[in-house]
Structure formats: structure tokens, C-alpha cells
Amino acid sequence: MKVYKDIFTNDEVCSDSYIQEDPFGNPEFREIAFEVKSNKRIKGNDDYGIADNSEDAVDGMGADVEHVIDIVDSFQLTSTSLSKKEYSAYVKNFMQRILKHLEEKKPDRVDIFKTKAQPLIKHILTNFDDFEFYMGESLDMEAGLIYSYYKGEEITPRFVYISDGLFEEKY
């Protein structure tokens, strides 16, 4: 299994157990980002058969049961809110950090990143109100944000990751 980690914090943010798709259905964005679909799951419904506390149950589930988004729960992502102005300042700084990283570690990616990042960020800014932003476990605002949005009538969000802000680790 491959786990994707943030290049600046080493936060685990995704794995190859999720099918990677073109971000926003746009193949041109695929060179610098990928999108995965999340699912909801039930957390805390542990029934060990010790006792039947049905008075605590609601619809057959215990009181400690909650529905969670699998990616958020598995990788301990935390939602954060940003104004459009704050996001613009963040993304400018983050893209400069990525570019510097690429110049040092992957110079063959520099031109691709310069060409493809701007349209992706423009798309995010144009549709800013449709996004929720997530941070990795370290809660470091210098790290990469994860972009979440709902596609069409889907009941769980999709998550978009900037590929050049991640590295793979095999387990």
C-alpha cells in the first residue's frame, strides 16, 4: 500500500486505496493534482455481545455511534475556514514553497507546475464558496491544504490533492 504524505510536514493525507481521478473532471489538472471520492462509515458501533443496552440505542445503534467521512477520520484531517483573501495569501506562499522544492528536488517538474498550477488555483478561486479546506494532523498552515467539494448530487465529498505537495511512502 502507498500512503501519500505532505512534503513539508510528513502528515499522512491519503492512500492508494482510493481511486485517483481527474480533479473536477478536468484531465488538464491531472498533471498536478488528483481527486478521490470519500465514503461515509459508522464509527463507534462496537458490539461485543456483553450486554444488550437497548435503552441506550437509537434505531439499533448505540449512543456512541457517529457517521464519519472515511478520509477525514482515517487520516485525522481537520477542517479549517479561510476567507478568500486569506486563501489567496496562503496559496501564493504555498505555491512558492512548492516551486522552490521542485527546483531543488525535481527540476523536470518546474515548467509543468508553473504552467498547470495557475489554472487549477483560478478554478478554486472562481468556485471558492463550494470548497471546504482541510489540514493534516500537524495543523500546520504552511503545509498543503486538501480541498473538499461535493460533485453533483453525491452525498459524500470529493477531496483534491496537489500532487507536487506530496510524496509516496510504501508500506
From Swiss-Prot:
InterPro entries: Mss4-like_sf, Mss4/transl-control_tumour, TCTP, Translation_control_tumour_CS, Translational_control_tumour_p
Subcellular location: Cytoplasm
PROSITE patterns reported in the protein's UniProt record: TCTP_2, TCTP_3
Keyword Ligase attributed: no
Source superkingdom: Eukaryota
Keyword check for Calcium: yes
Additional comment: Seems to be one of the target of artemisinin.
Its job: Involved in calcium binding and microtubule stabilization.
Name of the protein in its database record: Translationally-controlled tumor protein homolog
Organism: Plasmodium yoelii yoelii
